[in-house]
């Protein structure tokens, strides 16, 4: 039986029921709905709506239901209930009779679902924090293993300057740490309890909402009933945080896909995160990384979806808000599996050091060092930049690296060049000169890894 049937005389259309029912989506809020109902039983007992014995009986039945559903989750969807709240109430009434009909006193599905959803976000958010921390640890471990592996750094996807693989790993550690910070902040803002807000104006029973919030492990109750039942900022923020994090994961995946390609060959991926071709037996495809990149779009889509759903809703609750969950659940599921998969990819990744080093030695990645050398001899940087550009053109024509010029040839570009230019053009020199906070010098990378491990 619907929770709202008394107002209606005609039968509900089967098509409308299919369209209106949300149980196929919100069944995932079962545990939160039961936990919230247990807290609500205590709250209405505290204001004399039910006796202590009735409260105990309700809580006992709710806990039994929790155990039963955990043993056989299929019974939720098999019930045909309108939503998860209807399922719990119907199951409760089946256990304790008319006493079960008292539980909803003073409560609306509006504050009930808002509470369930915040509880779910807190629980899933904590698991996501742990996943982000695991990925951070894998990046740091990989940075330690390959801290001194040299490879080209890129701008515009062209070889720019040599960097270390450890430095590359630490760049993504910074991004993951910002993701952690954003998620932690979002969960802090979501840590308020809407229960007791009623449909929109507040419950008519003078219960202690601070105690109710504490019983559900919220930091505090919400402060405005209209906002409480119509707020979905926590959904938007979680989807937004996930979108930014997925953008970082997608960028990392793109880097690794390129590094793994035959054109680069800087890394090798484990067999456990790659697949083959049904036609071409030689193929070893980076499918895990490509799926991370691909799933980013669906996460973005869910963020845009909830923003669009909420953008023109008047206060307070509107049925449009039933559409908040499907996208959120998909975002959390997608983000979680991508974090797990990224960590797995990194755990088995090996750098092909000779290939990476050879690539770093090509492409005139030491051109900036030659310009800096000229500056050290007194030449203004803009002039040095021009001189080195001319030298690079000449080197390309001769098919030699910059250090392949004889001293006499170097002097045709700038007479101030001496024999001491050659030590400045080695890969080792290029790296060592970046010995500044945040730089790619080995000493800086070691210090950064140590700091991350300490943190």
Swiss-Prot record:
GO molecular function annotations of the record: argininosuccinate lyase activity
Keywords carried by this UniProt record: Amino-acid biosynthesis, Arginine biosynthesis, Cytoplasm, Lyase
Subcellular location: Cytoplasm
Pathway linked to the protein: Amino-acid biosynthesis; L-arginine biosynthesis; L-arginine from L-ornithine and carbamoyl phosphate: step 3/3
BP GO terms, sorted: arginine biosynthetic process via ornithine; L-arginine biosynthetic process
UniProt GO cellular component terms: cytosol
Record EC number: 4.3.2.1
PROSITE patterns in the cross-refs: FUMARATE_LYASES
Domain of life: Bacteria
CDD domains linked: Argininosuccinate_lyase (cd01359)
Reactions this protein catalyses: 2-(N(omega)-L-arginino)succinate = fumarate + L-arginine
Assigned protein family: Belongs to the lyase 1 family. Argininosuccinate lyase subfamily.
The protein's name in its UniProt record: Argininosuccinate lyase
């Amino acid at each position: 039986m619907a929770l709202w049937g008394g107002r209606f005389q005609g039968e509900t259309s089967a098509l409308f029921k299919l369209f209106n029912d949300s149980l196929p989506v919100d069944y995932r809020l079962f545990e939160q709905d039961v936990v919230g109902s247990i807290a609500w039983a205590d709250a209405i007992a505290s204001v004399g709506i039910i006796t202590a014995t009735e409260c105990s009986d309700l809580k006992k039945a709710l806990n039994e239901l929790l155990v039963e559903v955990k043993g056989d989750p299929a019974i939720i969807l098999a019930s045909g209930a309108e939503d998860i709240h209807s399922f719990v109430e119907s199951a409760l009434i089946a256990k304790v009779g008319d006493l079960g009909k008292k539980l909803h006193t003073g409560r609306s599905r509006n504050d009930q679902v808002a509470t369930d959803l915040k509880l779910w976000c807190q629980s899933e958010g904590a698991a996501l924090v742990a996943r982000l921390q695991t990925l951070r640890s894998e990046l740091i471990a990989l940075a330690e293993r390959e801290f001194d592996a040299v490879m080209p750094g890129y701008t515009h996807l062209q070889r720019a300057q040599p960097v270390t693989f450890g430095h590359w790993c630490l760049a993504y550690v910074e991004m993951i740490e910002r993701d952690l910070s954003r998620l932690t902040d979002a969960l802090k803002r979501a840590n308020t309890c809407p229960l007791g807000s009623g449909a929109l104006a507040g419950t008519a029973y003078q219960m202690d909402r601070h105690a109710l919030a504490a019983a559900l492990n919220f930091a505090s109750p919400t402060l405005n009933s209209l906002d409480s039942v119509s707020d979905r900022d926590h959904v938007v923020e979680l989807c937004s945080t996930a979108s930014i994090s997925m953008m970082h994961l997608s960028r990392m995946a793109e880097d690794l896909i390129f590094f793994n390609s035959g054109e680069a060959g800087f890394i090798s991926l484990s067999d456990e995160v790659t697949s083959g071709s049904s036609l071409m037996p030689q193929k070893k495809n980076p499918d895990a990384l490509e799926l991370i990149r691909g799933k980013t779009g669906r996460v973005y889509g869910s963020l845009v979806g909830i923003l669009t759903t909420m953008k023109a809703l008047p206060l307070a609750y509107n049925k449009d808000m039933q559409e908040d969950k499907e996208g959120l659940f998909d975002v959390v599921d997608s983000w979680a599996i991508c974090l797990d998969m990224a960590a797995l990819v990194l755990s088995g990744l090996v750098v092909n050091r000779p290939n990476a080093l050879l690539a770093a030695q090509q492409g005139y990645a030491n051109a900036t060092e030659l310009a800096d050398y000229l500056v050290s001899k007194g030449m203004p940087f803009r002039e040095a930049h021009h001189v080195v550009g001319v030298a690079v053109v000449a080197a390309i024509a001769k098919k030699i690296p910059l250090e392949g010029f004889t001293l006499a040839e170097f002097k045709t570009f700038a007479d101030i060049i001496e024999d001491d230019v050659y030590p400045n053009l080695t890969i080792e020199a290029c790296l060592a000169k970046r010995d500044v906070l945040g730089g790619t010098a080995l000493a800086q990378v070691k210090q950064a890894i140590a700091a991350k491990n300490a943190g």
